[in-house]
């Protein structure tokens, strides 16, 4: 699924990244988003084909072969230190990471960090990805599982995520898969940029 952005946020339209661009779930709904993230629906970008991935990924990215669904695990101390380091805010022990708002592609645009010292809502998606990773999470389309809870404090957090990037426009992996399947370039571009006109200017 992707979001397309024209000039303002209200113009975003969600479409599936597969042959059937209709009948997709409302990923702004938390229960629906959670179910979608935990499954692996058919999509052009759902591939682990190393040949295709090598066409669009840098060498260091090729260590990962599944960008469609992924997981990251943090201990309590790792997550608390990371969030403190990246945000500059001491939340104390991290009690929960609560989804507040999702966009049409299921990506979180507002996330509540609940700590033993304070609670704060952060956003948008790029800031969420930055705060929860030493570099960046693959995307902000994720759900969080709290594990080994002792006296109300989780000792481990598992982030289950979907996709790679901000979810707007052309998906490089999906476009490469479409090309490998024989789709002409015009059809690939119009799949990702619905309503666009392709004209020769020379």
Feature roles, as predicted:
Residues 1-5, 9-202:
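Conserved, single-site charged/polar hotspot
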């Amino acid at each position: 699924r992707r979001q397309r952005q024209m000039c303002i946020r209200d113009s975003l339209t969600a479409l599936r990244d597969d042959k059937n661009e209709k009948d997709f779930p409302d990923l702004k709904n938390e229960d629906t988003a959670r179910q979608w993230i935990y499954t692996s629906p058919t999509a052009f970008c759902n591939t682990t084909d190393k040949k295709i991935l090598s066409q669009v990924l840098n060498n260091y990215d090729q260590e990962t072969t599944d960008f469609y669904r992924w997981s990251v695990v943090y201990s309590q101390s790792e997550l608390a230190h990371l969030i403190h380091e990246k945000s500059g805010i001491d939340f104390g022990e991290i009690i929960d990471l609560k989804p507040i708002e999702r966009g049409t592609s299921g990506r979180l645009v507002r996330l509540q960090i609940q700590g033993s010292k304070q609670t704060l809502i952060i956003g948008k998606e790029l800031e969420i990805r930055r705060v929860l990773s030493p570099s960046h999470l693959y995307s902000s389309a994720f759900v969080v599982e709290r594990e080994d809870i002792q006296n109300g404090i989780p000792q481990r957090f598992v982030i289950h995520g979907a996709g790679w990037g901000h979810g707007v426009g052309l998906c490089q992996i999906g476009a490469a898969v479409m090309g490998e399947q024989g789709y002409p370039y015009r059809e690939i571009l119009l799949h990702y940029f619905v309503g666009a006109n392709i004209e020769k200017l020379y």
